[in-house]
């Protein structure tokens, strides 16, 4: 969730928590550096005004990672999770810290469910999850190298199995795979309390941050906070997503298949970047999402000699306001 909204909830909703039935995924893309978050819940903005629905569980730190805090959601736990990620803790360390420092103390952590993903200092993906014994059944999580899928008060384990299978089988961008994951739970009663409504959930969202995005201005940020009774939030979100994809700038004419070429990679001291548009700009971002280098590019080969520390960077190539491509660069001065 955007940091400003999260801080507002700390003031407005301090002490409030809900046993919301929720299924969700957090994931990273090691090629593009994108970080994604998607989910749905039988909590919506009508039941809990100001929550904006399921999206309340989501917090993305562009260039670093994403955190979902669900089941007896508590604003302080979510804010603390963000702070721990900003301090550099790994997903496993963040969850261990939250268990030891729950906002309500004692054994309150047994009611919580968390999913966390990030990039380590070398750009490798990491994931972790926690499903406390106090979460309501059916509850559980699924972990992969670059994703965490979790849910509670579900129809059964088949919901998470389907979500994971759809995510792994999907092709395309990270956002395409997140939507496929949600569609894996698009059955009446996926969140069991919504069975009487004939829907999987009451609210749904999908979000993706590219390297360099601001917390409050993500590349993709779609939300269905509530709907009339009987309408399926995942279907509504899919329509919003399909419409959003149509608004993306079309590829430059005659260069649809001409992906920029960066070599050598890993690079030491210099690298070449070949582009197929007349002019573009290169921006390099570190894993904290900070811009560390920028240079104009011209059609053909461009030799680049950035003065940056060793590490993993994401090269963002754009023409004007249009993003052309994002590449991963391993830099070894």
Spell out what each predicted region is.
Residues 246-263, 333:
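Residue-level detector of functionally pivotal "anchor" positions at catalytic/ligand-binding pockets or at interdomain
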Residues 281-285:
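Beta-strand signatures of extracellular beta-sandwich domains
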Residues 275-280:
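Short proline/glycine-enriched turn/loop motifs at strand-loop junctions of beta-rich domains
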Residues 15-19:
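Sec/Tat signal peptide C-region and signal peptidase I cleavage site
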Residues 265-272:
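Short coil/turn motif common to extracellular beta-sandwich-like domains
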Residues 20-248:
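N-terminal nucleophile
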Residues 4-13:
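Sec-dependent N-terminal signal peptides
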Residues 291-294, 301, 305, 310-333:
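C-terminal tail/sorting-segment detector
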